[in-house]
Structures are given as structure tokens and as C-alpha cells.
């Protein structure tokens, strides 16, 4: 290959590169011209925007007659009205999507809060169970202490029982509930009369034999009840005699008055109630 042919090929390659550069420059020039040919953005007045918004709220899509009417009323072209409605529908769609995303985000936040609260409640329940178990262990220890205390109480009760067996009860302790209104002076005299006898009887009681003590106390209780009833009967008979005398005097006085008024005598039954024995006796 000669030098002339090599130079020729080199010249052809340079020429092809120049052609490529010129073609790219022309392409960019065409694009820039097209950009320059774009129409300027139309500006709407406040009155036009308010009217377009009112029409959009009434109907999203316009019929040809409505489009012509709005264009004539606002002094706009049909294409301007169409583009405005298209842009407004696109804007409404974007707002709806954003609102839906916000709602989903709020729901996720609420779910996260709910899960956190449920986990905290579960942990709280576990801590309560642990506390209850600890309290149960403490209660078991306390039960052991209570058993010791109950044993001590049982020993004290046994001591009191032996003490009761060695000491006979007084008359005031064996007094029936129906005789609580009985005069206290009489009860005091009964206790004074029986004190000497009970003291003498206690001398023969053996505090170390429970059966003998119990039998002896029963005998003492019978004797005290007998003495107590004897004094009550004496007290009631005295009161009955006094009441009978008073009633006879009243009856005689009444019969004399009735005899003077009516010329005849009337016998009437009178009832006397003894508060100690709760008995009624009828006197004719």
C-alpha cells in the first residue's frame, strides 16, 4: 500500500467525523427550536378561577355545549377550558392519593401503638403473676407462723379450762337471761350467803384430777341453783302476799262503791304477774 492511498483513507475518515459532528449540531438546533415554539402558559384571573371551580364542583366532565357556554362567558377558548379541567382532575386525583397515603400511615401508627400497649399489658400481667407467686410463698411462711401462734393459743385455752375446772362459777354467771331484771340487791345477798359454802367446798377439790373437779363443780352448780330458786320463791311469795292484800283492799273498796250505786256486789278475777318466775296466778 502506497503512501498516497493511506493519505486518502485518512482524509476520508476525517471527513466522516466532520459529518457526524455537523449532524449532531443540527439535531440539537432542531430540538431547541421546538422548545422555543412552546406556547406560553395562560394566566387566569381570580374571577375566571372562581367560576371554573364552581363549574368543576357541579360537574367534573363538560359537555360541548357547557364548554362553549363557559368559554363565551369567561372570554376563553375551548382548548383553555378543556386543559384547565384536565389539570384540575389530575390535581384532584393526586390529592386523593395523598389523602389515602396519610390515612394508611395513621392506621399503621395506631396498630403500632396497639401492639405496644398489648405487649406492655402482657408484661404487666407476667409481673403480677410473679408478685402473686411471691406473695403465695410469703403467705406459706406466714401460715407456718400462724400455726405456731395457734399452738400457743391452744395451750392458753387448756390452762384456762383447768382453771375453770378448779374454780366453780358464781351465781351471776349461771343467772338465766329471763331473770336479768331481778333486783341486784337480792343477787348480792345470795352470793354473800353462798360464799362461805363454796370456799369450804373448794378446799376439797383436787386441781390435778380433772374428772373430780368437773363432778364437784356440777354438784356446786346444782346446790347454788337450788339456793337461788329457794330465795326467788321466798321473794315471789312475799310479793304475791302483798299484791293479794292490795288487790283485796281495792276489790272491797270497789264492791262497796258498786253496792252503794247498784245494790249488788260483783266478784272479778285478778291476775298477778311475777317478773322473776314469769308466771300468772289467778285469784277468784
Curated annotation (Swiss-Prot):
It comes from Schistosoma mansoni. The keyword Nucleotide-binding does not apply. It holds the Pfam family Homeodomain. It comes from the Eukaryota. InterPro entries: HD, Homeobox_CS, Homeobox_TF, Homeodomain-like_sf. Keywords: DNA-binding, Homeobox, Nucleus. Signal peptide: none annotated. Residues 128-156 have a biased composition (Acidic residues). Its main location: nucleus. This is Homeobox protein SMOX-5. Gene3D superfamilies: Homeodomain-like (1.10.10.60). Residues 117-172 are annotated as: Disordered. It is found in: Nucleus. GO terms for molecular function: DNA binding; DNA-binding transcription factor activity, RNA polymerase II-specific. Residues 37-96 bind DNA. GO terms for cellular component: nucleus.
Amino acid at each position: 500500500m502506497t503512501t498516497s492511498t493511506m493519505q486518502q483513507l485518512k482524509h476520508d475518515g476525517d471527513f466522516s467525523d466532520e459529518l457526524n459532528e455537523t449532524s449532531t449540531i443540527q439535531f440539537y438546533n432542531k430540538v431547541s427550536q421546538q422548545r422555543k415554539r412552546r406556547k406560553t402558559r395562560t394566566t387566569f384571573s381570580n374571577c375566571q378561577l372562581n367560576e371554573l371551580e364552581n363549574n368543576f364542583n357541579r360537574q367534573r366532565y363538560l359537555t360541548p355545549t357547557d364548554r362553549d357556554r363557559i368559554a363565551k362567558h369567561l372570554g376563553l377558548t375551548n382548548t383553555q377550558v378543556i386543559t384547565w379541567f384536565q389539570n384540575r382532575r389530575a390535581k384532584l386525583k393526586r390529592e386523593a392519593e395523598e389523602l389515602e397515603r396519610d390515612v394508611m400511615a395513621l392506621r399503621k401508627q395506631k396498630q403500632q401503638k396497639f401492639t405496644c400497649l398489648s405487649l406492655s399489658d402482657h408484661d404487666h400481667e407476667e409481673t403480677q403473676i410473679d408478685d402473686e407467686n411471691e406473695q403465695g410463698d410469703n403467705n406459706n411462711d406466714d401460715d407456718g407462723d400462724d400455726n405456731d401462734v395457734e399452738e400457743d393459743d391452744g395451750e392458753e385455752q387448756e390452762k384456762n379450762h383447768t382453771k375453770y375446772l378448779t374454780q366453780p362459777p358464781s351465781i351471776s354467771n349461771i343467772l338465766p337471761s329471763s331473770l336479768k331484771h331481778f333486783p341486784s340487791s337480792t343477787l348480792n345477798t345470795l352470793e354473800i350467803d353462798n360464799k362461805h359454802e363454796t370456799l369450804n367446798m373448794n378446799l376439797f377439790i383436787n386441781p390435778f384430777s380433772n374428772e373430780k373437779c368437773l363432778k364437784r363443780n356440777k354438784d356446786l352448780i346444782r346446790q347454788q341453783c337450788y339456793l337461788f330458786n329457794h330465795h326467788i320463791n321466798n321473794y315471789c311469795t312475799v310479793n304475791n302476799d302483798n299484791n293479794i292484800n292490795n288487790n283485796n283492799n281495792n276489790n272491797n273498796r270497789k264492791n262497796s262503791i258498786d253496792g252503794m250505786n247498784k245494790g249488788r256486789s260483783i266478784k272479778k278475777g285478778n291476775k298477778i304477774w311475777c317478773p322473776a318466775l314469769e308466771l300468772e296466778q289467778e285469784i277468784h
